[in-house]
Amino acid sequence: DNTILYADYFLSKVLGLLKSNSQELDTAMFYVSDHGESLGENGLYLHGMPYFMAPDEQIDVPALMWLNDSMSKVFDVESIKNKEDLPLSHDNLFHTLLGLMGVETKLYDKGLDLMTK
């Protein structure tokens, strides 16, 4: 599918840009797809089936986190790796980004931040 190919291309460009600036800046990327995609599994194509009958390919979405060396020293990377098989939601994205950027707000829930133990 061309959109998957383009997403790979785009992410490689973003990572290249971040890496090229990681000596001067703290850089990180957290990518989460908004939905999965069926590419012919069980005769299904595309996405958008009702949740109760949608196959795992549409529900379980990819996520990718990258931190440069300086950010990896600030955050517990092993703690993040230990969460890779946990079921997560977009709720985690909001709180993880707040924690990653050091934003203090009463809305922040440390329990939903992937960067915490």
Segments (PLM) and residue ranges:
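Catalytic domains that recognize anionic headgroups
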Residues: D1-K117
